[in-house]
Regions:
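Long, contiguous domain-sized segments
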Residues: 1-12, 19-29, 33-238
Length: 238
């Protein structure tokens, strides 16, 4: 909602998610109905961003995905291998990040990004039209000797607009440059700092939980010696 309000009349508004923009699928768990409710709200929020022309992206630091590696494996497969692809992994252990950021001969130079690819997943049917999921890899390092490859997830409405894609690319690099030798979007870094819970806040939450547990007739055990020692140190954040 804040992004939508800010976007009115603004030249470009970009929102970042720490991690994939695909909501993790918990359908096989007993909380499937809860997940479905969250998914509907999430898709509605994404639709709101799309309708208000707002750029959004998920930033994955040090990704371990091997989606492109899997495509390479398909090119190596024989007709016999194709009959049992789940067991055909000649490049097992190789990640997309290694391919794009291999130190001696990285495919991506400082500040460069890959082509945009479509994302196939079990939940792709939920992300239709402008919400369909895509991704690209980007080298956020400014040092040729030390590539830093990240994956960026984006929806179709960003993919289809070259200007949005370029603005996002530039914004990611600008944010990562702020962090110097450890490139990472500064906005996400600040969000992590702000989200830290102080010792006092943690104790307040603990008290609320204990009161609710007592109200329901539950028993509250003593703190472990380890936790008591931690609390006695007066730590200010967790």
């Amino acid at each position: 909602e804040l992004a939508i309000q800010t976007g009115a009349g603004a030249p470009a508004v970009i929102t970042f998610t720490d991690g994939p923009i695909e909501l993790w699928n918990l359908r096989e768990s007993e909380d499937a109905s809860i997940f479905d409710s969250h998914l509907r709200r999430y898709l509605s929020a994404l639709t709101g961003l799309m309708n208000n022309d707002i750029v959004t992206a998920g930033y994955i630091d040090k990704p371990f995905s091997d989606w492109l590696v899997r495509l390479l494996e398909l090119t190596l497969a024989t007709d016999e291998d194709l009959k049992n692809l789940r067991e055909f992994h000649p490049l097992r252990g190789v990640t997309d990040r290694w391919i794009f950021g291999e130190e001696k001969q990285p495919l991506l130079g400082p500040g460069e990004r890959s082509a945009v690819f479509g994302l196939q997943s079990k939940s792709e049917k939920e992300y239709k039209g402008g919400l369909s999921l895509h991704f690209f890899y980007i080298n956020v390092s400014a040092d040729e000797r030390s590539p830093k490859i990240a994956r960026v997830d984006i929806p179709r409405w960003v993919v289809d607009d070259q200007k949005k894609l370029e603005v996002l690319h530039a914004a990611i690099l600008q944010q990562c440059r702020i962090m110097g030798s450890k490139p990472y979007p500064y906005l996400l870094h600040r969000a992590h700092e702000i989200a830290k819970v102080s010792l006092e806040e943690k104790q307040q939450v603990d008290q609320m939980l204990q009161l609710e547990l007592r109200r329901r007739g539950g028993e509250i055990g003593d703190l472990s010696n380890k936790q008591s020692a931690k609390d006695a140190q007066g730590r200010t954040s967790f």
